[in-house]
C-alpha cells in the first residue's frame, strides 16, 4: 500500500468520466488499498480513483468518527438506482478542492448497486452522511465536482485561488 498524490482543480482529469471495470483483479485490490491509505492520510471520508489520476469507477468511503472503529467501504462500478424525494443539506468539502466548503442539497436517501472488492454484486440503501458522501464520490466518477453546483463566477474565483496557492505554496492565506 502507498499514499498517492491527490490531483486538484483545475486539473482536467477531474472532469473526465471514469471507465467501468470488467473484473476485479489484484491490481484493483491494490488500488483500493492505496485509495484507503491516501484518504486516511489526508483526513478525508471519501476518495474516488479519478482523484489520484486513475479513470476507473472505483471509490472508497469511511464515515466513521475518530472515536469509532474504522468502517471502510469500497465500491466498484457503483450506480445509484433510487433516491428519495426528501433532501438534506450538508456543507461538503473535497480533497481535490482544498480549503473549500459548499452547502449542497442532495437526496437524503440513496440506493446503490455496486461490486465489492471480492467481485460480488451488492446493494446498499443509505442515508445521512454516508448517502451524501456516496453521491459526492459517484459524482467524481462522472466528472462532476462540488464547485459545479456554483455559478461560473464563484467557480472561477475558487479555481483561481487554488491555482495561485499551487504557484506560491509558501504564501500564507488569511
Please annotate each region the language model reported.
Residues 1-174:
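Positively charged
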